[in-house]
């Protein structure tokens, strides 16, 4: 049922994205392309389909998840990191910690789905690697000279300059996405 809901109501094939907020009849109520949610959903749906184990869902969902990954790669990934979102046609070019984490996993997943040795698979592998390099250099908090880094900054600009006015941890900021990314990378690589 959830896969059908994603495919039939949440995924927008015309815009190659998910819609994120709805009225009670499943009509989208805002024009928002959330790049992080699209790349996160792509790999989570693929994992869910794998667990369900029904070929019909794999056949239905794989084109959708590959379309989501392809679209964010083309419109939001600049070769080293993922922009946050596009709200009514205006792109927020800041880099939010969780979007960067989900980008690594999402592109690794897309590479596997396409075949890691294919041209498209190689494109996604290079993108995941570039994203990880951006994270290591700019998103991980290296203040106080701690070489391995600490928690991740909440937000950096597209050039990697951190916004230090945001807390490192708060109710909406914890190591969930970055911790899960590390576990997924260990499992996939």
Please annotate each region the language model reported.
Residues 1-189:
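Glycan-recognition and catalytic cores of secretory/periplasmic carbohydrate-active enzymes
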């Amino acid at each position: 049922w959830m896969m059908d809901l994603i495919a039939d109501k949440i995924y927008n094939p015309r815009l190659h994205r998910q819609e994120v907020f709805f009225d009670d009849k499943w009509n989208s109520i805002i024009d928002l392309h959330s790049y992080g949610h699209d790349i996160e959903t792509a790999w989570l749906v693929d994992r869910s389909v794998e667990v369900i184990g029904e070929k019909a869902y794999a056949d239905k969902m794989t084109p959708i998840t590959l379309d989501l990954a392809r679209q964010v790669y083309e419109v939001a990934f600049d070769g080293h990191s993922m922009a946050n979102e596009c709200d009514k046609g205006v792109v927020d070019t800041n880099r939010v910690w969780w979007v960067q984490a989900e980008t690594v996993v999402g592109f690794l997943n897309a590479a596997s789905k396409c075949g890691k040795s294919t041209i498209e698979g190689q494109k996604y592998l290079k993108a995941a690697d570039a994203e990880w390099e951006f994270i290591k250099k700019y998103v991980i908090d290296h203040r106080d000279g701690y070489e391995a880094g600490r928690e991740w900054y909440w937000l950096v600009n597209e050039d990697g300059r951190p916004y230090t006015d945001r807390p490192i941890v708060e109710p909406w900021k914890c190591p969930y996405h970055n911790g899960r990314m590390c576990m997924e990378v260990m499992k996939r690589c």
